[in-house]
Amino acid sequence: MNSLKKLSLVAISFVLAMASADGAERSIKINRQYLNFPVSHSLERKAMTFTVDGRKESRSVIRLAEGAADYWTFRDVSQLRGKTIKITYEGSQKALDNIVLADSIMGGSMIYHESSRPQYHFTTRRGWINDPNGLIFYRGKYHMFYQHNPYERDWENMHWGHTVSTDLIHWDEQQLALHPDEIGTMFSGTAVIDYSNTSGFGRGKDNPAFVVFYTADSPSAQRQCMAYSLDEGRTFTKYEGNPIIDSHEKWQSHDTRDPKVLWYAPGKHWSMVLNERDGHSIYTSSNLKDWTYQSHLTGLWECPELFELPVEGNPSERKWVMWGASGTYMVGDFDGKVFTPITPKQQNLIGSAYAAQTFSNIPQSDGRVIKMAWSRLGFGDAPFNGLMLLPQEQVLVRTHFGGWQLLSRPARETESIFTLAEQG
């Protein structure tokens, strides 16, 4: 409480709070790094809207505490330094006034020291996480985006969080990558590097566009969108032509989501795998903006993946693997437009693992297919929820019955966190 009083006094010089006919309202001049939000689960969620320099930026719901907080969440606003944020809140002015602008995270000294905090698996500092998104290796760093509610430990307000690593074990959490907008909240997707500048977003050979694809979810529909970065994934600009695919009417379904995009070299085009209604569809594009429907395969569900692997022990034999979020997969052939399964559905994930995705853009000199999956474990009253399982390498083997099976092995990087114990 003493810290809250001290920081509130500091904030007086640049904060204007006022009553509004539509609820509480407060304008804050950003000259510190973090907005801190007190959360109380005894309260109902209320809508909170951010407007930056007169432009509506995003809308979320939050349980802002009027008194003592169960815990604090935060938003890094350093990219908005010098700008003014207007926060409109459908709850009380008293709760809104408890938001603290500071150069530190409230309760930050306890982060990673909580009694329930996993030490070897990635967890976010505060809030909820689920599906890994946009896994990609670029210029020496593994980027992992993820489904994230930064304002509460429970699911809601889907943003894209962002973390980076040089070794797949030690992760450095970044600023939020994508915020909800007028099209919807930010559901799952993927990332590519547009080396040939097919989209026109790039700025020369040395600065290709880092492009992410995501689903914008709203009560009326799920639509596919994209954004691009020219600073190696630190900030993103949403494509002004979004959405790039709106197929909910065609399928008469709200379940049209989770784009996975890859470059299909033999055809010199982009391919997208998209969950639509009862299975996975394939779309193609020459420029990442305009997409043409090609085919559909039933039997798999959300968070689609599609990648090629050599058969272990016979590198000249290569097959494609398509899977869904629950870990069911098929092995088959892919011509850039149609995936033809040659095996029945099999199971790769078990237990709490869900929505695994593989890293794109792994150097050919490495050659591995590395996946990360979300674990649906909860942590009770902790101020965070959800974790990512350790990375695994995917291997395709021939079975004794003449078929193919996908195996998962701990990535070699995990050896650094294990110690072999001698047995007497």
Give the predicted meaning of each segment.
Residues 1, 14-15, 360:
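Compositionally biased, low-structure terminal segments
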Residues 9-10, 244:
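Short amphipathic alpha-helical "recognition" segments used for binding
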Residues 352-360:
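Catalytic and ligand-binding motifs that coordinate phosphates/metal ions
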